[in-house]
Amino acid sequence: MKRAVIAGFAAGAAMMVGGALGAVSRSDIKSSDPRTMAEINSETMNPMIGGQAMLPDRDILENIASSPMHSTLVAALKDSGVAAALKTNGQFTVFAPTNAAMAGSTQNKATLARRMSYLIVPGKYDSQALLRLINESGGEARLRTAEGGTLVARMNGPTNIVVMDEKGSTADIAIYDVRDRNGIIHVVDRVLEPNGVARQVAVN
């Protein structure tokens, strides 16, 4: 089966990993803008998380930190040293588990950085990009994470994308396409974890 592999890591990343907003009106668009209204609105609207607005001009860490559903994840990102990379000018896609998903997760300091960077895919992959990759790769898109491992995205029914980790556990995407200045957040209902194989992750 042909598989799409997303490789590489954004240059300059630090540490181990390098209510909806209102739609714009037609009067806000310059006549020279080649984008359609639908394309522009999709770039300027965001879902809310836990009742909090997610602002597209914030970086990923700022938006995650403003979510009441992700305080455990934010603490883990900071403790691991991975948080700094999510404030850079690179482009990242984060599969962000909720507090409820992380409640039973063991916070082993020795492996925390690895586990946090496994949740991050270098590059900007919204739901449309993921769907395109899934279709192009025959039903399963393999995503290379910042940790060096692999996540597998596939369809579960006609509209739902699920993500499987290296241990075979599958997470549903509960909230899609939270757009940030430096990437995309997808809220997931399970912590995605790498396997036990140690990998050397490049530090830029």
Predicted features and spans:
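Sec-dependent N-terminal signal peptides
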Residues: K2-G22
